[in-house]
From Swiss-Prot:
Phylogenetic classification of the source organism: Bacteria, Bacillati, Bacillota, Clostridia, Eubacteriales
Coiled coil regions in record: none
One cellular-component annotation, GO: acetyl-CoA carboxylase complex
Cofactor note: Binds 1 zinc ion per subunit.
Key words, A-Z: ATP-binding, Cytoplasm, Fatty acid biosynthesis, Fatty acid metabolism, Lipid biosynthesis, Lipid metabolism, Metal-binding, Nucleotide-binding, Transferase, Zinc, Zinc-finger
Species, as recorded: Desulforamulus reducens (strain ATCC BAA-1160 / DSM 100696 / MI-1) (Desulfotomaculum reducens)
Biological process annotations from GO: fatty acid biosynthetic process; malonyl-CoA biosynthetic process
Subunit (UniProt): Acetyl-CoA carboxylase is a heterohexamer composed of biotin carboxyl carrier protein (AccB), biotin carboxylase (AccC) and two subunits each of ACCase subunit alpha (AccA) and ACCase subunit beta (AccD).
Zinc finger region(s), C4-type: 38-60
Protein's name according to its UniProt entry: Acetyl-coenzyme A carboxylase carboxyl transferase subunit beta
Length: 288
């Protein structure tokens, strides 16, 4: 009997009962998308305040990536944009596996037909032909439709005697289209050569990231080349370069600040000042 007493559990199990939560202590779910963390400094940012600041972190000046619609809204005068060549669609000329599904998925996610939006509008009252790439669409890769839309935009600028502003953000040529994708480098460069012969202005704006075939073609051919702070700009990644040359690359290699220091970029402009900077450049070149 005595031994049984000592064998009994020395604890009591308490089962919590469900009680009605008082109104004051009720849990309130925070809506998704209300806050966002800065990728550079980890600051928690209020989305509405971030949008007011052109999607630039107020603490470390990190420039978040924009989609094409956001870029157009921030750059062009309100109500002035007229889109062109939106009817062009991408095919699968090489019958690359799952390419069509990838295109459809990107179209659904971005509400775009391709990785670039082109058209006409005004910046500070200055008429301009504009092209804006979107890295959210298959990483802004350049396929046949992207190259065609940019070439047509440049040709339209020549016809109407207007300056061209192209915003670049891309992972390079689109591998699913093979040589047809690489051909767009020559096509866009040739169109810009005609623009130059016509004596018209081309301003290239390089945003994060601008790499591969886009860097090796129209992105680097501007009469004036502007970059956003911290933008990654280059042909291939630093790891590949280090493995090839067997040397350690300098700090900040392929970033906008490094390229500005070494003469590859004319100026670095913070996003909130970018529209005014473009308007001043266009006015100085007599486009108004």
């Amino acid at each position: 009997m005595v031994l049984e007493i000592f064998r009994k559990p020395k604890y009591v199990t308490v089962r919590p009962e469900k009680t009605e939560t008082t109104q004051g202590n009720e849990r309130r779910d925070i809506p998704e998308g209300l806050w966002v963390k800065c990728s550079r400094c980890n600051e928690i940012l209020y989305t509405k305040e971030l949008d007011k600041n052109f999607k630039v972190c107020h603490k470390c000046n990190f420039h978040f990536r924009l989609n094409a619609q956001e870029r157009i809204h921030m750059t062009l005068d309100e109500g002035s944009f007229q889109e062109r060549d939106n009817e062009l669609i991408t095919l699968n000329p090489l019958n690359f596996p799952d390419y069509q599904e990838k295109i459809q998925s990107a179209q659904k996610a971005t509400e775009l037909k391709e990785a670039v939006v082109t058209g006409e509008g005004t910046i500070g009252g200055n008429p301009v032909v504009i092209g804006v790439m979107d890295s959210h669409f298959i990483m802004g890769s350049m396929g046949s439709v992207v190259g065609e839309k940019i070439a047509r935009a440049i040709e339209r600028a020549i016809e109407k005697k207007l300056p061209v502003v192209l915003f670049s953000t891309s992972g390079g040529a689109r591998m699913q289209e093979g040589i047809l994708s690489l051909m767009q480098m020559a096509k866009t460069a040739a169109a810009l050569a005609k623009l130059d012969e016509a004596g018209l202005l081309y301003v290239a704006v390089l945003t994060d990231p601008t790499t591969g075939g886009v860097t090796a073609s129209f992105a680097s051919l501007g009469d004036i080349i502007i970059a956003e702070p911290g933008a990654l700009i280059g042909f291939t990644g630093p790891r590949v370069i280090e493995q090839t040359i067997r040397q350690k690359l300098p700090e900040g290699f392929q970033r906008a600040e490094f390229l500005r220091k070494h003469g590859m970029v004319d100026m670095i402009v913070n996003r909130p000042q970018l529209k005014d900077t473009l308007a001043n450049i266009l006015s100085l070149h007599g486009t108004n």
